């Protein structure tokens, strides 16, 4: 039983540490990307959230596959940013195109569905 608990603990620690969890959102960079007409993805996360780690893993791959899109992420406990986007939950994913929000999901971690949303915004 102890071995199973140790394995589970190591597994979840690895998942949460495998993704760089930093805030890359800066309002001035977001505004510039909007004014430049870029497609923008904003994602929210929180420490120790395994679904956040799963979503970040998909988005990290998407950055390589959709390099014409600007990506921002932030810790949902940052109330100023969360209120700016009207986000109340971690793993909220937003896509902006032509200066408006065109997609919003909460908790989506499926690569296929996230990629479909990205493709439809291009």
Mark where each language-model region is.
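Extracytoplasmic/secreted envelope proteins and their assembly/folding machinery
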Residues: 27, 31, 46, 56-59, ...
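Non-catalytic, surface beta->alpha helical segment in thiol-disulfide oxidoreductase systems
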Residues: 97-122
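Thiol-based oxidoreductase modules, predominantly thioredoxin-like and allied folds used
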Residues: 44, 67-80
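Sec-dependent N-terminal signal peptides
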Residues: 4-14
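N-terminal leader/targeting and pre-domain segments
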Residues: 4-5, 18-37, 120
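Short active-site neighborhood of thiol/selenol oxidoreductases, capturing the structured segment around
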Residues: 35-47
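Structural micro-motif
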Residues: 85-94
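Typically the conserved alpha-helix immediately C-terminal to a functionally engaged Cys/Sec
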Residues: 51-65
